[in-house]
From Swiss-Prot:
The chain crosses the membrane at residues 12-32. May help in the organization of the PsaL subunit. Pfam families: PSI_8 (PF00796). It comes from Thermosynechococcus vestitus (strain NIES-2133 / IAM M-273 / BP-1). The gene is psaI. It is a single-pass membrane protein. Keywords: Membrane, Photosynthesis, Photosystem I, Thylakoid, Transmembrane, Transmembrane helix. This is Photosystem I reaction center subunit VIII. One of its GO terms (cellular component) is photosystem I. It comes from the Bacteria. It is found in: Cellular thylakoid membrane.
Length: 38
């Protein structure tokens, strides 16, 4: 995953990861934190 291949491949996989996966992880961590505090 180096060079021009990574440069052309990365944006297509990075956008859905940031838009969908990161919020899901953050919401999951917040849920676990809130449940742990309760």
């Amino acid at each position: 995953m180096m060079g021009s291949y990574a440069a052309s491949f990365l944006p297509w996989i990075f956008i859905p990861v940031v838009c969908w996966l990161m919020p899901t992880v953050v919401m999951g961590l917040l849920f676990l934190y809130i449940e742990g505090e309760a």
